[in-house]
Amino acid sequence: MALLSVLALASFCMGAAPLAVPRDSVATKLDAHLRTYVEKEGFRGAVLVAKDGKVIHRAAYGLADEKGKRPNQVDSQFLIGSLTKSFTAVTVMQLVEAGTLDLQAPLSRYLPKLRADLGNSLTLHLLLKQRSGLPMHLDSLVERESETDVSSAEILRLINTARLSFKPGAKYEYSNLNYHLAALVIEAVTGKSYAQVLQAKTFGPLAMSDSGIERATNVPPKRSFGYAKGLLGVSRDENNVSYALGSGDIYATVDDLYTWAQALFGMKWLSAESRTRLFTGGTRAQGYYGYGFRIQPYQRGPGVQERGVLVRHGGSMDGFLSNLHHYTEDRLTVIVLGNVRPFPIRALTFELKELALGVEPGSRSRAEVDE
């Protein structure tokens, strides 16, 4: 498949226009579909669907706190897991625009304490494209049993024990360590914590007041609790996420994520070069990966033969799931945040897209889930 480019993001009117669907009818169908998932799959979380710059459905479902019977609200805060990687990639590009970072420079320039073979062979480009050869996870004991915050120095120490599984640049292989390292670089060149940089460059300027970086000493007041399904019902399933620096430690609301999406896809926040880097993906074998986003084709609404460009990322971690999908040509954004696992979040997200475009979910959406 040819590379999908950011140039498509400016092409909102390609091909025949899809048939219009009344907004109130769409909202009713979206809500009914979500309630079916609540009943049959135990979905709990918050959802926002926006079309042509207007929110057409925004609602919360299920419980945020099983013990206290506190319901999820539209302003509930959820851990977003690997959707954090998209924020890290954007922050790197902001620093590139400022002349602070060079995507092709060896990491040793920024992290002199990184093991020599890693520092000399890895670049930010390879990290963001998931082509470093680093393993998927940091350390199972750290990820599952840490009761106190893991420091950046400790994360770097653990990365220095990692072995490469292939020559850097040889192929695509998804790894959380890539984005741990990118966050460490951000901290090194700014002299500030990852949380402080995100606040200064994204959360503050975009007025994302319900978003931030979670730590043991910073658990947000409106956060939903994460749960795992079991034979006897659901049970709390959470962990200290400080180990997930730059790859899974952000919490947010659906409203804040929509604000962020509007800035990203509105063509005004980042330079054209940055958008090209972020939103140019590869082949399916390369994970459709750009910089912190997956870019792949999608099927549009009735009467439109051309396939559109989907920009997406999701997350899955203890008790939480997330998806942010932006269907470029249809100017459609679907955001799903959940606080129970396992749950078929990708299927639900694609089905919500179908309904918003006036298509009944079925074989088309199932095929896109598998793509």
Regions found by a protein language model. Give the residues of each.
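Acidic-glycine-rich active-site phosphate/pyrophosphate-binding loop
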Residues: 60-68, 153-157, 226-233
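Extracytoplasmic/secreted proteins, especially bacterial periplasmic and envelope-associated proteins
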Residues: 25, 29-33, 82, 87, ...
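Catalytic-site signature segments of enzymes, centered on catalytic residues
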Residues: 60, 75, 138-220, 242-258
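Short linear capping/connector segments at secondary-structure termini
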Residues: 19, 63-65, 106-113, 140-145, ...
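Active-site helix/loop module of the DD-peptidase/beta-lactamase fold
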Residues: 79-83, 95-139, 161-163, 184, ...
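Catalytic loop of the DD-peptidase/beta-lactamase superfamily, centered on the K-T-G motif
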Residues: 17-59, 146, 187-192, 196-200, ...
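Bacterial N-terminal signal peptides
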Residues: 2-12
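Short active-site loop at a secondary-structure junction
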Residues: 36-46, 67-129, 164-177, 245-248, ...
